[in-house]
Amino acid sequence: MAIVGLGTDIAEIERVEKALSRSGDAFAERILSQSEFEKYQELKQKGRFLAKRFAAKEAASKALGTGIAHGVTFHDFTISNDENGKPMLTLSGKALELSKKSDIANIHLTISDERHYAVATVIFES
């Protein structure tokens, strides 16, 4: 196995909360997949959840080498958690297509947050 992509992103939670207050759920719908949006709607700390998902998706797009561009959208990345709470990243759409071209076999995702910031790192291995 070899690392074929590495991406990290940091999001300011307050900035995400301000975007939510301006545009409401429209901002969340732009970032989140359907399953993520359903979970988001149940939460009290929506801004924190969205900041972590935003950072993870930006990190994944950087690891892919495209950013959110060239046909890759936020909806191409879905973050869920396994039974132990470990974050899991699933690719779809253009991101999945590009990952197959790069022979990506393993995806590693870590997400962390503290009072002001959320940070995520993604590693793609062949």
Curated annotation (Swiss-Prot):
Organism: Aliivibrio fischeri (strain ATCC 700601 / ES114)
Source organism phylogeny: Bacteria, Pseudomonadati, Pseudomonadota, Gammaproteobacteria, Vibrionales
InterPro entries: 4-PPantetheinyl_Trfase_dom, 4-PPantetheinyl_Trfase_dom_sf, ACPS, Ppantetheine-prot_Trfase_dom
Keyword Lipid metabolism included in the entry's annotation: yes
Binding site for Mg(2+): 9, 58
Pfam families assigned to the protein according to its UniProt record, in alphabetical order: ACPS
Its EC number(s): 2.7.8.7
Cellular localisation: Cytoplasm
Name of the protein in question: Holo-[acyl-carrier-protein] synthase
Function: Transfers the 4'-phosphopantetheine moiety from coenzyme A to a Ser of acyl-carrier-protein.
Enzyme class: transferase
Catalytic activity: apo-[ACP] + CoA = holo-[ACP] + adenosine 3',5'-bisphosphate + H(+)
Domain of life: Bacteria
Main location: cytoplasm
Keywords: Cytoplasm, Fatty acid biosynthesis, Fatty acid metabolism, Lipid biosynthesis, Lipid metabolism, Magnesium, Metal-binding, Transferase
Family recorded in the similarity comment: Belongs to the P-Pant transferase superfamily. AcpS family.
GO biological process: fatty acid biosynthetic process
Cofactor(s) listed in the protein's UniProt record: Mg(2+)
Alphabetized Gene3D superfamilies for the sequence: 4'-phosphopantetheinyl transferase domain
GO molecular function terms noted in the UniProt entry: holo-[acyl-carrier-protein] synthase activity; magnesium ion binding
GO cellular component, one term: cytoplasm
